[in-house]
Amino acid sequence: MGGAVSAGEDNDELIDNLKEAQYIRTELVEQAFRAIDRADYYLEEFKENAYKDLAWKHGNIHLSAPCIYSEVMEALDLQPGLSFLNLGSGTGYLSSMVGLILGPFGVNHGVELHSDVIEYAKQKLDFFIRTSDSFDKFDFCEPSFVTGNCLEISPDCSQYDRVYCGAGVQKEHEEYMKNLLKVGGILVMPLEEKLTKITRTGPSAWETKKILAVSFAPLIQPCHSESGKSRLVQLPPVAVRSLQDLARIAIRGTIKKIIHQETVSKNGNGLKNTPRFKRRRVRRRRMETIVFLDKEVFASRISNPSDDNSCEDLEEERREEEEKTPPETKPDPPVNFLRQKVLSLPLPDPLKYYLLYYREK
């Protein structure tokens, strides 16, 4: 599934293409996609395909096409502080992007059938937290993953504001999925080969919208034990954050506000006025035409009166542009102002590193 947009050279170019094709339509979703490099969730030997609009599967590891994830993120209408359940959470790529929008007071849970995939997802999550240049720009709702079949979730589990299922849902399981939602909640899932958005408008009232045609592998049916009983999946508890954790969130938030105020004071509106460099135009001095006549091929050139002096003209044009245009300089590497501020605080080093989530940069 995929191939709806052109491949990108890097993550940003892929996002540009998804925006141009109207798969990404809102700023929050765009920011989340740009913050997490899709290639980081690929095995090293397959990273050359990371920026293509194609699904990828290797063993139990699977990623949907970027255009599908874009539609899912837009349809979920995510907001800070909501609770999210990802059924078939896989590599954790989608859950991590969702966590950037939910913020520190959201709930971010995932259920994955394969334990090896959960280990893979935890490794990728740890890598993102430790090394990403984008992590400190957001307040992150870290996802929690449990192993199990999403069709065996305990009936006394909490309901969620947003639910996504990453496998094809059979019609017989539609009601089961809908019951995972709070009133006012949104469920997005592949149903009868259509990516479907279902909004719970009341205790027994629903609105359904078909988004686009998709092809997903169907949900794997539960395997019952010898006693005939299914193994109920217990979702992670919705725990209250510790006072220490709340203090870290508050301190980081205060520092971010100070940085923002300093930026506004320094740059007026907070936006840097970066110089624009004029690109040198390449002028074509001649045109070649090829004519097919029966089996013969004829080539001709339409000359320009300035052909004879083309080299001199181009050299003169180059010199003029060099005089007018200031030399281009490489952009400075991004500065993590939050990290700088924290490290400058009169605090013990262990506390500083706690405030920085023990990140490497």
Swiss-Prot record:
Recorded GO MF terms: protein-L-isoaspartate (D-aspartate) O-methyltransferase activity
One cellular-component annotation, GO: cytoplasm
Region AdoMet binding motif, residue ranges: 85-94, 160-164, 181-191
Lipidation (N-myristoyl glycine): G2
Active site: S64
Compositionally biased spans, kind Basic and acidic residues: 321-331
Annotated region (BC-box), positions in chain: 240-250
Biased composition (Acidic residues): 309-320
Span list, region CUL-box: 345-348
Biological processes annotated in GO: protein modification process
UniProt keyword annotation of Lipoprotein present: yes
Tree of life domain: Eukaryota
Keyword field contains Metal-binding: no
Region (Disordered): 303-336
Intracellular or extracellular location(s): Cytoplasm
Keyword line: Cytoplasm, Lipoprotein, Myristate
Record InterPro entries: PCMT, SAM-dependent_MTases_sf
Domain notes: At its N-terminus, contains L-isoaspartate and S-adenosylmethionine (AdoMet) binding motifs. Also contains an extended SOCS box motif, where the Cul-box is separated from the BC-box by ~90 residues, within its C-terminus.
Function recorded in the entry: May act as a substrate recognition component of an ECS (Elongin BC-CUL5-SOCS-box protein) E3 ubiquitin ligase complex which mediates the ubiquitination and subsequent proteasomal degradation of target proteins. May bind to the methyltransferase cofactor S-adenosylmethionine (AdoMet) via the N-terminal AdoMet binding motif, but probably does not display methyltransferase activity.
Family membership: Belongs to the methyltransferase superfamily. L-isoaspartyl/D-aspartyl protein methyltransferase family.
Listed name of the protein: Protein-L-isoaspartate O-methyltransferase domain-containing protein 2
Source organism per UniProt: Homo sapiens (Human)
